[in-house]
């Protein structure tokens, strides 16, 4: 099975919160698609609670679009990582990491402004697969953690696992 790009970086050296360009590619029409790793927690040391990350998933995508879309950028998708340490954001365009970090901070400030669970978009059995598994309080705790810390940039060339280590791991 081919090794996915996300598994060629050393998770023990990742900073969090941090932005990382996980992948870039060109479409057949020449558009750039960029996938960002938005790392909320240090891998294997911290994890976002499931109710909080689920609520954040419902809020984050809209708020990020409000702050990042435009000037050659259009968010396609923002999805939580299965390991619950961050989100992947796929977009058309190639914004600088600092622009992404600034939008991320602004989106987290927006999360703190949500006053009631009833304001969470798509929070019903018709539009959400586990609509009862939410916590606005946990989502706001996650947002506050991001706002309380500087967002760094994780560089792939500093995190790439050496070929010897990949061989040792039998990959």
Swiss-Prot record:
Superkingdom: Bacteria
EC number in record: 4.4.1.21
GO MF, any single term: S-ribosylhomocysteine lyase activity
Enzyme class: lyase
Comment on bound cofactor: Binds 1 Fe cation per subunit.
Cofactors demanded by this protein: Fe cation
Pfam family membership, one: LuxS
SUPFAM superfamilies named among the record's database cross-references: LuxS/MPP-like metallohydrolase
Any GO BP: quorum sensing
Binding locations of Fe cation: 54, 58, 128
Keyword Lyase part of the UniProt annotation: yes
Presence of keyword Nucleotide-binding: no
Assembly: Homodimer.
Family: Belongs to the LuxS family.
Protein name as catalogued: S-ribosylhomocysteine lyase
Naturally occurring in which organism (per UniProt): Sodalis glossinidius (strain morsitans)
């Amino acid at each position: 099975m081919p090794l996915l790009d996300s598994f060629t970086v050393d998770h023990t050296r990742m900073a969090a919160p941090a932005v990382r360009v996980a992948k870039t590619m060109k479409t057949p029409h020449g558009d750039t698609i960029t996938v960002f790793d938005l790392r909320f927690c240090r891998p294997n040391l911290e994890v976002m609670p499931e109710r909080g990350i689920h609520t954040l998933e419902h809020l984050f995508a809209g708020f990020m679009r409000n702050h990042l879309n435009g000037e050659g950028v259009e968010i396609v998708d923002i999805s939580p990582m299965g390991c619950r340490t961050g989100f992947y954001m796929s977009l058309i365009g190639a914004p600088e990491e600092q622009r992404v970090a600034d939008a991320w901070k602004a989106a987290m400030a927006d999360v703190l402004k949500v006053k009631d669970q009833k304001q969470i978009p798509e929070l019903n059995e018709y539009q959400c697969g586990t609509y009862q598994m939410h916590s606005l309080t946990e989502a706001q705790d996650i947002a506050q953690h991001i706002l309380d810390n500087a967002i760094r940039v994780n560089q792939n060339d500093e995190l790439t696992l050496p070929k010897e280590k990949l061989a040792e791991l039998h990959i």
